Amino acid sequence: MRFVSSSAVEPTLLPPADEATVRRRGEELRALAAHHGVSVLRFASPGRLVGRVAEDKDALDTADFEIAARALLGAEVGLFSDRVLGKPHVSPDLIAAQPV
């Protein structure tokens, strides 16, 4: 069985953003997400966030958020649209993601 488990962004040498880092910068991260059309931001697991991507946004907007979030946190961040949650074989951490 395969899981939906990787974002469409090039790999980096940064460590994945841990929960403490994401929560410590949560207010800034939520504001950054809103600027990029992402709401209801949630922490899934190290380096993995889930959010509601606005209908008028696309994969390039998501990638722009990931790049900006990496710069803010100094750590790897991948964003998964909450639209994937209804798909088969979704990784359990995405389903169990908790609000930032």
Name what the model sees in each region.
Residues M1-R42, A54-V100:
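Catalytic core of pol beta-like nucleotidyltransferases
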